[in-house]
Swiss-Prot record:
Zn(2+) binds at residues 411, 414, 429, 435. NAD(+) binds at residues 34-38, 83-84, 114, 137, 176, 293, 317. It is an enzyme of class 6 (ligase). It comes from Acinetobacter baumannii (strain SDF). Residues 594-678 form the BRCT domain. The lineage of its organism: Bacteria, Pseudomonadati, Pseudomonadota, Gammaproteobacteria, Moraxellales. InterPro entries: BRCT_dom, BRCT_dom_sf, DisA/LigA_HHH, DNA_ligase, DNA_ligase_AS, DNA_ligase_CS, DNAligase_adenylation, DNAligase_N. The gene is ligA. HAMAP family: DNA_ligase_A. GO terms for cellular component: cytosol. GO terms for molecular function: DNA binding; DNA ligase (NAD+) activity; metal ion binding. This is DNA ligase.
């Protein structure tokens, strides 16, 4: 066969298959049978196998992506991929509409309603109609380049075609990759038949497929892409509404979710929500709600964005999903400060998109409140990413042999006595750092980012070092360099890893008194309290010598916390560890003359979504002026700073007559004290 004839035949088959793909996936109107489609596909594949040098870049057979990658490259999003706010009931939905319509006075607002697909959000870049890059959402600012994997998705166009519209020079399309229910069921059946691990839900299957370094694995999975929006288009597409944008995307070859509704009122949106909820079991894909968007693109621009989400859209989530299961056992876990937490081991149950087999019961008081026993039938609830919880016990199903749960008398890890001071809800192991569970959690806390910030000393290192008996307490961290040969013998720990760890430990020796106090893991002492203690006592020696009465005078330190701090510094073992840490070279700058702190001791509350700054920035400015930032409003609150969507805290402030300040006024006040956004 002549070369030109081969290439021409390949081109004809590619165009024909693309046309039928569009009819099947996008228009949902198949024009040929599956067997006819397979015949065309295999005809093209046979030609390509015979003449591999003439395989075309946009061939559907090349969607099996090539060589496996060693890692995914990071990519910064030109337009951030923001998340959506959530509403969970009609009242919240109507409040969202009020906020929208108050910002668009005297304008008619229409809402575009779409299915909220339960998949993995990605961004696709096309240059002159050719797919050049696919990137995961990541943290919204930076994602991972998964181009090879997205090219394997069968319904995703690699080259854009349209008889109606001109193909833009640059186009960035956002959408969701997911696995339809039928494909998910078949995949799990195949996995089970091969004796391999099955997937908990379609979303996990889709996400796991896209994160395979070998694109051939992704190609074998039944993935689908559904477009939901346009991030960039050059030249501008000239479209004026969200609804038209979605239709335009279908003309270019993209598939969109199987239902969209244009609603003239928020009441109509609520009706569609109820309709979709009824139809949910019959849909081809998993959804966890619907997305409500202001339809007019100019109105979207007018509304703008909050710091992390658009004002013109929200996700209307479905109610919690529940399932019945039985409690097989209740175990007790020991935390960093010795707290004993009961954990119910359940007969595994699929609820809210995941298989749940463990649920925390928080404390013995919660066990008594629920009257939950080993062997009981319970209702487990879960919504979205919320941690599953036991909502109800069904005593009518209780077996005769059901066991009442008692607080253990001794620690399940070290056998030290369990204590529960009068008036407290939490029981604790009295073993301190003698208890292995407390020791490992204490070390994890000590090295964490907000404490000593020892980069690279993660859980795998800590567990290995504990097994080798190189870490008996946190002070041993600063002697690890003496065991270099032992460290090199740890699996997957090469010369570079060991040196990086030693360097990070050395770098952590220069810190601040506040960080050091926080790192000690004293019960009741968080970041804010540690900062207050450092400001008040100025030196470690003064803090160690302080009695309960002196400690109680520190802002943010109550009677009980003062006793916990005093007890910590009275324990001989703790003093020994402190002395070894200081001897190892941990140090901080000597205290300077106190700076002006006009808000010293005042309690401030931040509520709502802040637009002009982050909560961390606002907190840092307040703390620099001596104030403490509280999570709740009380009669002692000096002022409340309210952003968007401020709720119950704002109402409580009004009832108590607490002053309320908006962001602009707050920033002006801070500027007057010399505090500005950095």
């Amino acid at each position: 066969m002549a070369i030109t004839s081969v290439i021409e035949q390949m081109r004809q088959l590619i165009q024909l298959i693309a046309k039928h793909n569009h009819a099947y996936y996008v228009m949902d109107q198949p024009t040929i049978s599956d067997s006819e489609y397979d015949h065309l596909f295999h005809q093209l594949k046979a030609l390509e196998e015979q003449y591999p040098e003439f395989v075309q870049a946009d061939s559907p057979t090349t969607k099996v992506g090539g060589q496996a990658l060693s890692k995914f490259e990071s990519v910064t999003h030109v337009v951030p991929m923001l998340s959506l706010g959530n509403v969970f009931n009609q009242e919240d939905l109507f409040a969202f509409a009020r906020r929208v319509e108050e910002r668009l006075p005297n304008q008619k607002v229409q809402y575009e309603v779409e299915l909220k697909l339960d998949g993995l959000a990605i961004s696709l870049w096309y240059e002159n109609g050719v797919l050049v890059r696919g990137v995961t959402r990541g943290d919204g600012e930076t994602g991972e380049d998964i181009t090879q994997n997205v090219k394997t998705i069968r319904n995703l166009p690699k080259v854009l075609h349209s008889e109606k519209y001109e193909i833009p020079r640059l186009l960035e399309v956002r959408g969701e990759v997911l696995m339809p229910k039928s494909g998910f069921e078949k995949l799990n059946a195949d996995q089970e038949a091969k004796g391999e691990k099955t997937f908990a839900n379609p979303r996990n299957a889709a996400a796991g497929s896209l994160r395979q370094l070998d694109p051939n694995i992704a190609a074998a999975r039944p993935l689908a892409f559904y477009a939901y929006g346009i991030a960039q288009c050059e030249p501008n597409h000239g479209l004026t509404t969200m609804h038209d944008s979605l239709q335009w995307l279908t003309e270019l070859g993209f598939q969109i979710a199987e239902r969209q509704y244009l609603c003239n009122s928020i009441q109509e949106v609520q009706q569609r929500y109820e309709q979709i909820q009824q139809e949910r079991p019959n849909l081809q894909v998993e959804i966890d709600g619907m997305v409500v968007k202001v339809d007019d693109l100019k109105q979207q621009q007018q509304l703008g964005f909050l710091s992390r989400e658009p004002r013109w859209a929200t996700a209307y989530k479905f109610p919690a999903q529940a399932a019945l299961t039985t409690v097989e056992q209740i175990d007790w876990q020991v935390g960093r400060t010795g707290t004993l937490t009961p954990v119910a081991r359940l007969n595994p149950v699929f609820v809210g998109g995941v298989t749940v087999s463990n649920v925390t019961l928080h404390n013995i008081g919660e066990i008594h409140r629920l009257d939950v026993r080993i062997g009981d039938t319970v209702s487990v609830y879960r919504t979205g990413d919320v941690i599953p919880k036991v909502e109800k016990v069904w005593p009518e199903f209780r077996p005769a042999e059901a066991e009442v749960v008692h607080l253990p008398e001794s620690c399940p890890v070290c056998a030290s006595p369990v204590v529960m001071p009068e008036g407290e809800a939490l029981a604790r192991c009295s073993g301190g750092l003698y208890c292995a569970a407390q020791r490992i959690e204490a070390i994890r806390h000590f090295v964490s980012r907000k404490a000593m910030d020892i980069e690279g000393l993660g859980d795998r290192w800590v567990e290995s070092l504990l097994r080798l008996d190189l870490l008996k307490d946190v002070a041993d961290i600063y002697h690890l360099h003496e065991h270099r040969e032992t460290l090199l013998g740890i699996e997957k720990m090469g010369e570079k890893s060991v040196q990086n760890l030693i360097d990070a430990i050395e770098a952590s020796k220069k810190t601040t008194l506040a960080r050091f106090i926080y790192a000690l893991g004293i019960r009741g002492v968080g970041e804010t309290t540690a900062r207050m203690l450092a400001n008040t006592f100025q030196t470690l020696e003064a803090l160690k010598a302080a009695n309960v009465e002196a400690l109680k005078k520190t802002p943010d330190v109550g009677d009980i916390t003062a006793e916990w701090i005093a007890d910590f510094f009275l324990a001989p073992h703790n003093i020994e560890v402190l002395d070894r840490l200081i001897a190892a070279g941990i140090h901080w700058d000597a205290p300077t003359a106190p700076t002006r702190q006009p808000l010293n001791g005042e309690s401030w509350v931040l509520t709502g979504t802040l637009e002009q700054m982050t909560r961390d920035q606002a907190t840092q400015m307040l703390q620099a002026l001596g104030a403490r930032v509280s999570g709740s409003v009380s009669s002692k609150t000096k002022c409340v700073v309210a952003g968007e969507k401020a709720g119950s805290k704002l109402e409580k402030a009004a009832k108590l007559g607490i002053p309320v300040m908006n962001e602009t006024d707050f920033l002006s006040l801070m500027a007057g004290y010399g505090q500005t956004l950095s």
